C-alpha cells in the first residue's frame, strides 16, 4: 500500500483486509469481575425479570475476549437464575477476540478476581491457563458485529445492555450515535450500564439512575 488513498480504498472494498486491520487496531483490556458492583446490579435486575418466567436477554457490547460475558454467567449461576431463562450475547468488531471468546481459555491475570472456590467450579485447568466450563453457563452466543452496522438491529431486543469503557475512544457525535442506536434494541424500561470512565452525553431517550451499586440508564 503506497498511499493513504490506496489504503482507504482497500479498507472500503476489501472485507478481509478491513477485518484484519480492525483486529490489529482495536484495544482489548479486560478481566473477570471487572467493576463488580455493576455486574451484581445487572444480575439482580435480571433475576427479578426472570422470576416472571420470561427469558432475560443481555447484550455485552463490546465483549472483548469474553470475560464480562462469562462473569455474568458465573454470577447468574451463583444467585440461582435458571440457565434456560437467560441469554447473553457478546458482540465485538474484532473477529480474533470473538474466536477467543468461543474458546474460553484465560490466563492467570484474567481470573485474578475469581475466588479459588469459583475457579474449581467454573474452570478446568489447562496447563497454566483456565478454560471456562461452558456447560455450566446460561445460553451464550458471540458474534462479530460493528455497532455502527445495521446488523446490530438483527439481534432483537434486550433487557440489559453493558457497554463499558468503549465510548472513551469516541468523540461527542459518535457517543450520542452509540446511545441512540442502543436505544433501538433496548426494551422499554431496560437498563444500560456504561463504564466509569465513559462520558455519556445527555439523551432524552434515557433516565439516569444513581443507585448504591452504581449508575445506570433506564430507557423511557
How should these model regions be labeled?
Residues 1-59:
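Conserved AdoMet
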Residues 43-47, 70-73, 77, 183:
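A structural alpha-helix within SAM-dependent methyltransferase catalytic domains
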Residues 54-66, 71, 89:
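Conserved class I S-adenosyl-L-methionine
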Residues 78-84:
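Short helix-capping segments at alpha-helix termini
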Residues 84-162, 166-170, 174, 199-201, ...:
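Extended basic-aromatic, gly/pro-enriched interface segments that bind polyanionic ligands
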Residues 176-188:
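A short glycine-rich, Lys/Arg-flanked "PGG" loop and its adjoining helix->strand segment in the class I
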Residues 188-196:
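Conserved beta-strand signature within the Rossmann-like core of class I S-adenosyl-L-methionine
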Residues 211-216:
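Short hydrophobic/aromatic beta-strand or adjacent loop that forms the aromatic wall/cage
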